[in-house]
Swiss-Prot record:
Entry keyword annotation includes Oxidoreductase: yes
Domain of life, per lineage: Archaea
EC id: 1.4.4.2
Highest classification ranks of the organism: Archaea, Methanobacteriati, Methanobacteriota, Thermococci, Thermococcales
Name the record gives this protein: Probable glycine dehydrogenase (decarboxylating) subunit 1
Lipid metabolism found in the keyword field: no
Single GO MF annotation: glycine dehydrogenase (decarboxylating) activity
PANTHER family reported in the protein's UniProt record: GLYCINE CLEAVAGE SYSTEM P-PROTEIN (PTHR42806), GLYCINE DEHYDROGENASE (DECARBOXYLATING) (PTHR42806:SF1)
UniProt organism field: Thermococcus kodakarensis (strain ATCC BAA-918 / JCM 12380 / KOD1)
InterPro entries linked: GcvPA, GDC-P_N, GDC_P, PyrdxlP-dep_Trfase, PyrdxlP-dep_Trfase_major, PyrdxlP-dep_Trfase_small
Catalytic activity line of the entry: N(6)-[(R)-lipoyl]-L-lysyl-[glycine-cleavage complex H protein] + glycine + H(+) = N(6)-[(R)-S(8)-aminomethyldihydrolipoyl]-L-lysyl-[glycine-cleavage complex H protein] + CO2
HAMAP family listed in its UniProt record: GcvPA
Gene name in the database record: gcvPA
Amino acid sequence: MGKHYIPNSAHKDEMLKEIGFSSIEDLFSDVPKGMVKEFNLPEGKSEYEVFTELNETLSKNKTVLEMPSFLGAGTYFHYVPAHVKYLIERSEFLTAYTPYQPEISQGMLQALFEYQSLIAELVGLPIVNSSMYDWGTAMAEAALMSARVTKRNKFVVPKHLSPEKKLVLKTYTAGPGLETVEVPWDERGQMDIEKLKEAVEGAAGVYIEMPNFFGLLEENIREIGEIAHDAGALFVVGVDPTILGIVEAPGELGADIVVGEAAYFGNPMNFGGPRAGIFAVRNDRKLIRQMPGRIIGMTKDADGKRAFVMTLQTREQHIRRAKATSNICSNEALVAVAAAIHLATLGPKGVRELGEVILKNTAYLKKRLAEVGEIVFDGVNFKDVPVRFEVPYSVIHERLLERNIHGGYYIGKHFQELGETALFAATETTRKEWVDGLVDALREIIGEAEL
């Protein structure tokens, strides 16, 4: 044909000629020979050969439909309607581009505005940003924001907090030197109110979750908020939004700031990410001006037509670094749009039904697990249930895997006082036969281990 198409090195040859070299090797000839290494790579393969090899490797993976999973502690199997994936894969949405030019980004900006509106209705607070990276970073940003607003240097959290969230909080607070104080749990697995009263003096903020890391619904959330406010601290509530159809919204319980995980709507597990952190505040100018991230607002253009814009974007790229409230860049907007599509599909009735089904499935899981282990705390559980065993959990987990079942998340390594305890989780996708199969397997494994 007379032309060399793929691979085509003509442009490289032209650049080399322009700078006076005949080859790439000549260009780097001053690099000592001893430092030049050959790539230890196999011979090249055709596209079909690569496809076949990757397909063979990927076929070893198992989905939660093939291998029932009870692994909770923050990542859960929720059903995502097919149209959600279809819509977010449209070219108008599927981009890493941040909509800095509102005149060409009205669709994405409106979708994010709808996300904010839906989350505001869900959490009971009017001001919501267009998402953070995930729940953990949203919580950590809330700690920093509390310190900026109150001019204090201490943030109070429950000891029974996700180990991953603790690490994120530690990372965020290390630079500014913000002290974090942990309040222990009581015999019910809930924040110890008396210990909180001792710890809250001089605090910038007090943080609590609904449900907590043990899957329990904290019964004293309103009282915790009052204790925080009496001490001059902000009250921060972290929430799993799938519960908000069946419990009172945190904004109605006195929360100043609400954080959480939006990716539980509209997004698959994806090995734990990407996510989208919820961040909402009450309508207070002091709080709004200190919010991290970006807020999408609705206004009118020069012709009087409705338009969507970035109302607040107090990032260090836009204003003086010392005045910036965050350095969040191209964040999890697509994940937030997916959450908005799913939420709009469910509506208030669907969100309530989702919460009811999860609560029912969790209760059945808890009832059956009580037959083979000790339910550590008495209370109402949502998704997660902590169960203690007499047999080392590492043995139980390994043998469950041999039976094609993924067991719970071992928390004894993080909370040694709980011993051989694991968190088992249920969602709306958990089938009765999966739970029955799990309990039968546990009974058999424990029996074998005790022989």
